[in-house]
Structures are given as C-alpha cells and as structure tokens.
Amino acid sequence: MKKLCLMLTAALLLLLCACTSEKQADLQPETPDISESAVSWDGLTFDRELPLSYATQFSVSYAGDDYTRITIGTDQDFLLVAENAETPEGVPASVTVLHQPLSHIYLVASAAMDYFDHLDAVDRISLSGLKADDWYIESAKAAMEEGSMRYAGKYSAPDYEAILESGCDLAIENTMIYHTPEVIEQLQTTGVPVLVERSSYESSPLGRIEWLKLYGALVGKEDLACSQYDELLAALSPILDQEASGQTVAFFYINSSGAVNVRKSGDYIAKAIAMAGGQYVSFDESGEENALSTMTIQMESFYASAVDADIMIYNSTIDGEIRTIDELLTKSPLLADCKAVQEGSVWCITKNFYQESLALGDLILDVHAILQDKAAENLHFLRKLS
C-alpha cells in the first residue's frame, strides 16, 4: 500500500509540472522571425520611376511608398528612406542612405536654391555657402537675415563646427567640390552625406530645368515639381514649335585684360538662343557639351565673327551690369563698328540670372521677344542698353 501511494504521488507531481510548463509556455510572448520581418536591400523592388522628359544626369525610382532610389551621373547613388520606415539591411557601401525629412541641409550649390524656392522648401536649408548679401533670391536672403539660415563657409572652406552643431543631414555641393576632394572626405567622415549637383552637365536647357524634379523627390514634393515643370513646358511650347528667325545673336563679356569670354556652340546658353529662334554666333566647331563650355578669345577674333550679328547680349553676371552702349565701348572701342551697336540692338543680362535656375525658360522667352521686336519691354532678364 505504501509503495502504491508513493507511485501515485510521483505521478501527480509529474502531471503538475507538465501543466505548469504548458501554462508558462502560453504566457511567454512569441519571438518574431526577424528574417521574415526585416527589410533587406535585396528584397526591395524599384518598379516605378519618376518620369523625365529631357534630363539625363539623374534618375529617381521607387520601391513602394517608403524607399526612393536616386542616381546622379555614374558615381552617385542614394537611398531615401521615408520617415518612420526601417533602414534596409545589406545596403551596399556604394549607396548613401538618407532619411526623410531632410530639414538641415547645407546648400553650397547656389543654383539649386531656386528649385527649393519654387517648391516652398527653403526652410529645409539650415546652412548656406553664400552670405546674405550675395543672394538675389529673396526667400534665401530673408532666411539668412532672420537667422533661420546661417553662413557655413564656401565649398573649399566649410565651417565644420557649424555644420555639426546644426545636425546637418545633407550637403549639396556643385562640381567645384571635386577640386577639393578632401572636403568631401571630411564631411563624410563626420557623418554628413554629400550630394554633388550636376545640372550643369545637362545638354538641354530643358534638362537643366527638369532638375526641379530631383529636388522635389528629396523634399517629398514630386507632384508639385512635375506640375510646375509641365506648366513651364506649356509656356514654351508655342515658341519651340516656330521656325527659326534667321537672326544672329552674340553672347559675351569682356574680361579685365580686354579678351572676350564666349560660350561654345554646345553650351546651354547657345542652345537656349536656338530654342528662342535665334542663330547663335559660334566661335568653335567642337559642339562640346559640358559644364565648362566657355572659351576666351582675343577681341579681334570676336569682332571678326560678331561684327554682323543682328543682336548682341552682354553677360553682366560676371563683372557687373552696364547700362549704356558708351559703357560697352569703353571696354572696347572696336565694337563701335558692329551692326548691333550701330542699330541699337545691344542688350544686357541682369546679375540675378544665374541664381534663378528655373528662369532659363524666361530667358528663352526674352530672347524670342527681342527677335520679334527690337523695342521689346518688360522682359525678365534682358535690358536694352541706352
């Protein structure tokens, strides 16, 4: 009997232990399968692209709503991760990860400010590569004057302390930064991603303007960027469809030594003049298309090609605006014999042109207007010399 009682007690203890273990197992939270829930780079499918009409120097593609891939040129690759989304595992070292919202940008590429301005996104920029007095874009100047945007040094000498204190999440540089690669390395070492703007390498003026879409992607305003670009194309469409006027246009400025700086035939200014219906007075035969497509020639060479030009446009963005033909002739009396000078068809482009990247369309409209009417008024960037 005693032996039987011991056996029954042992059986009851085993049963109790089993029940307790099952209960504890029921209370234990399930461990998620990390391999199934985590987002991986290889698992992303970029199956939707931002439509581009003319730009060739960048592309934007999407994997769902949370991941945007941006490529620039042949050597820049970015993954833009939506706010509150997971950073994928296994992102290649060649891909720079950015996190939305980008709200502490260091903007050194001054030509890009106009894109941010049109997207109502100047407030995303905390640091500037220009001082307040150097800005012609009012929203940028105002932001610096009120202190929401601060000067952080030019491309070759950034203020690293200010950049780190601001919590900078992206530095946007122009291609001049390639002359000081150590700056890129230092920024990246301190945790600041670097994007080098290449709109100047677009072969088409309309491709330059289309970079609005890239900045729209960076700040999450692609729809606004696309609609504004479509409006601009619609405004230019009647002009682009017209036949050339046959009139010749020279675009130039005179440097301090008396030589003349002109655009090569493949430059975007030369192409903008052609889009407006003019024939650009060319000084080369290469048709080279790159960001440095300017050349300096002697005044005698310029005179030989431009003496019969129907219209002259003086590029005052470099050495200051001129207002009269007499001021132009002070720089070079030889120009007095030029057809455009004698007929009073000499114009000056205003200094704010190069900061207003989207205004390239307005320049096309301006040139078209003076080709149609030598007395055209109320233009965006061109002013007739008196």
What are these regions (language model features)?
Residues H104-L107, R124-S128, L170-N174, V194-R198, ...:
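Structural recognition of the beta-strand scaffold that forms the well-ordered cores
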Residues H99, G153-P158, N174-P181, E202-I209, ...:
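Soluble non-cytosolic domains of exported or imported proteins
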Residues D241-R323:
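Flexible, glycine-rich surface segments
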Residues E202-D230, I311-S386:
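Structured C-terminal subdomain patch of bacterial secreted/periplasmic proteins
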